Regions:
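Short hydrophobic targeting helices and cationic amphipathic motifs
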Residues: 7-10, 23-25
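Canonical Rossmann dinucleotide-binding motif of NAD(H)/NADP(H)-dependent dehydrogenases/reductases
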Residues: 32-68
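Conserved mid-core segment of classical short-chain dehydrogenase/reductases
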Residues: 81-88, 92-94, 98-103, 107-147
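Conserved glycine-rich Rossmann-like NAD(P)H-binding loop of the short-chain dehydrogenase/reductase
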Residues: 64-80
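Glycine/Thr-rich phosphate-binding loops of Rossmann-like dinucleotide-binding domains
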Residues: 50, 76, 128-131
């Protein structure tokens, strides 16, 4: 209660922001077991700046059992093994443009996680133009098509 008395010295708008921040900090680390017993595959975690990385952490906090997937190259370049160890999650390499690889991910994930897959997160973002450090005014349209295929259309 003492923390709210101090707020009386600030403007109402400032007080509301502080109260909201307090509630956010109080609840952000709480888990509600929303995904308890669910199994999922998360595609695209590369490092702790990846959306997929943060979603994977939160899914496990909420009770899910997950498998992680990315390309062989991304697995070599990134820090996925660190996340896998932290979350006790298997890592299954796959090329999202290869149907056989995707079938393999689902088959292996079901075996490793012990049952059907309840959810999938497609968070694969890829651009050969960026990786090859080409500016967008020097765009290679074949690479652009591959970018769209992988980032927006794959599976």
């Amino acid at each position: 209660m003492a923390s709210f008395i101090v707020l009386a010295h600030f403007s109402c708008e400032w007080a509301i922001k502080v109260v909201l921040l307090h509630h956010y900090l109080s609840y952000k680390n709480m888990a509600y077991n929303l995904l308890k017993g669910k199994r999922g595959i998360i595609f695209g975690a590369l490092n702790d700046m990846s959306i997929a990385w943060k979603v994977a952490e939160r899914c496990v906090e909420e009770g899910a059992t997950i498998a992680l997937s990315n390309t062989e190259m991304a697995l070599r370049m990134g820090e996925v093994d660190e996340l896998a160890k932290k979350l006790n999650a298997p890592v299954i390499a796959a090329d999202a443009t290869n149907f056989e690889d995707l079938e393999n991910v689902f088959t292996k994930a079901q075996e490793l996680l012990g049952g059907k897959i309840d959810f999938v997160l497609h968070s694969i973002g890829m651009s050969p133009n960026v990786r090859k450090r080409r500016t967008y005014d020097d765009l290679d349209y074949n690479w652009l098509n591959k970018t769209l295929d992988i980032s927006a259309i794959s599976f």
